[in-house]
Amino acid sequence: MKIASIDIGTNAIKSKIFKTTPASIEFIKGIRSPIRLGGDVFNDGNLSEGKLDQVIETIREYEEVFKENSISHYEIVATSAFRDTANSEDARRYIETAINHPLRVISGLEEAKLIRFHPKSNTGKSKIFVDLGGGSTEFFIRNEEETVIRSFQLGAVRNMLKRDEKEEWQRLEEWLQSIKSKKRLIGIGGNIRSFLNSQGSKEMSLNEFVKKSERLSKLDTEEKIKKYKFSPDRADVIDHALQIFKFIAEQLEIQTITSTKWGISDSIAIKLFHELYSSKVTIS
């Protein structure tokens, strides 16, 4: 059986398709559509009807792909932009009515908690997962005693549009200072992954990360597109994402920075996988 997930993010909409059996789940295909909801939300406070219609059109395109793959089980979630827009509930209903499928707007803490489905979330103590999106940044740390999750309203699109607040930076700094230093930062999201790929690296030391990200920041958007083949919606926000990663890494005295292809759409699919197959188990 194949299943799928759709993640309506702040900078793009993404979907992933998986092949499953009762004992396994395997990634097949991913789709990404550069629809920036954060522009409406952080500039105007609301998601416009035109932008919502773009979301609907995109979901319908994904659903056609699902039909071609005989997929009837899929989940749709929305994150920071949908959380922050003043018309969140009306926007959700508008989309649900059009597509005849539930849309779940998840909180920042739920977004952080979903990182637990990452296959390496249980291994090693001295690492921190940082999921940096367009509108928010989520953290996941698993210690022997507890799991720590946090969410902050700092993100690549939000910061680019100067909608980040000094108080939120202070809140982040205070929290980072309250936790033990970590050796390894595992970055989640297209910006950190694209940056490392553009530099031909799977991981970097903090010093190398700082030097190369500063070098990148000296290029304008067009130069980034030409030299590194970044998409336009990546090239204009990547410096802002890397600035947040740099701040976090320096506060925690991180030794190495790496990335993962994992994202919310993976976690949502894994969660759906468990729900579907556990429902087939009978208890007598």
Q: Model-predicted segments: where are they?
A:
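Short N-terminal binding/cap micro-motifs at the start of the first secondary-structure element
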Residues: A12-K14
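Conserved ATP-binding subdomain of kinase catalytic cores across diverse folds
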Residues: I25-G39, K67
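Short, glycine/acidic-enriched loop or turn micro-motifs at the edges of active sites
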Residues: T10, G134
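Acidic, divalent-metal-coordinating active-site segment for phosphoryl/phosphodiester hydrolysis
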Residues: G135-I141
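Helical "lid/coupling" subdomains associated with nucleotide-phosphate turnover
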Residues: I17, D40-I71, T79-F117, S121-S126, ...
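Active-site neighborhood of HAD-like aspartate-dependent phosphohydrolases
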Residues: A4, I17-T20
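Short glycine-aspartate micro-motif
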Residues: I3-D7, K127-D131
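Beta-strand initiation motifs
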Residues: A23-I28, E146-V148
